[in-house]
Design a protein with these regions (language model features):
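Short, charged, surface-exposed secondary-structure boundary motifs
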Residues: 44-46, 68, 146-149, 202-206
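Conserved phosphate/ATP/ADP-binding segment of small-molecule kinases
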Residues: 97-192
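Glycine-centered loop/turn positions within well-structured domains
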Residues: 54-57, 182, 193, 214
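Short glycine-enriched, charge-decorated loop/helix-capping segments at active-site entrances
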Residues: 62-65, 149-153, 200
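Generic beta-strand/beta-sheet core signal
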Residues: 11-13, 50, 92-95, 122-124, ...
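Conserved post-catalytic alpha-helical subdomain immediately downstream of the catalytic base
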Residues: 169, 173, 198-226
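Conserved N-terminal subdomain of the carbohydrate kinase-like
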Residues: 2-91, 103
Length: 226
């Protein structure tokens, strides 16, 4: 988002450790506004092993315990509500690590709607009840299949059928389904569009989903219609 000329405002949790301090320093150096709260859990760290310009394996360092107690949850929500008047759009990036629970997601979606702010969600898992009434969700094909309970093949008709069911079930405004080499499909009640890719030699797919979400957020925040 920063690279696209936006001024992001980050609200999240950090471990009180070296990696957490490094992230704070990076945000400060880049001038990224943030409210980052320290917890007793270590900062989740991902190490990518690269060979011949391609990712070979990724090592994740984290704990399995819930990182969000009631006090921290309230701090997080209060921070989001303070940030809302200063932003044009809200992105919930859910990595399934315990921060984006049902309460947090629903309160953020509700508070954003109350101020007329669109909410984009990069989802994780099959519990989409917590994303109810979001503006747009960006699942990949595997995630679409899992949440719909259907074995969805990478074909326009099957993707649209599954997406239509999900839109109605969770009262969503739209879905943007990423489809690897077949591009993306945008599905909303009144309009749908399949967007093909242009062939490129891919060296590293890391962050492809994040790039889609960031570009979408920047465009919508600038008032560009889908």
């Amino acid at each position: 988002l920063l690279g696209l000329g936006c001024s992001p405002y980050v609200v999240s949790l950090l471990g009180n450790d070296h990696n957490g301090n490094t992230m704070q320093e990076m945000f400060a150096d880049l001038g990224i506004r943030n409210e980052l709260f320290y917890t007793d859990h270590p900062t989740i760290t991902k190490t990518r092993v690269i060979g011949n310009s391609q990712q070979v394996v990724r090592l994740d360092f984290e704990t399995e315990n819930e990182c969000l107690n009631e006090e921290t949850e309230q701090k997080l929500l209060d921070a989001v509500k303070r940030a809302l008047p200063e932003v044009d759009i809200v992105v919930i990036s859910d990595y399934g690590k315990g921060v984006c629970n049902d309460t947090v997601c629903q309160q953020v979606i509700s508070a954003s709607a109350g101020q007329g702010k669109k909410v984009i969600i990069d989802p994780k898992g099959t519990n989409w009840e917590k994303y109810r009434s979001a503006t747009i969700i960006t699942p990949n094909l595997k995630e679409l299949s899992a949440v719909s309970g259907m074995d969805v093949r990478n074909e326009d008709k099957e993707i649209h059928s599954a997406a239509d069911r999900i839109l109605k079930e969770y009262n969503l405004t739209s879905l943007l389904v990423t489809r690897s080499e077949k591009g993306m499909s945008y599905i909303a009640p009144e309009v749908s569009q399949d967007i093909p890719t242009e062939a490129r030699e891919v060296y590293d797919v890391s962050g492809a989903g994040d790039t889609v979400v960031a570009t979408l957020a920047a465009a919508l925040a600038a008032g560009i219609p889908i």
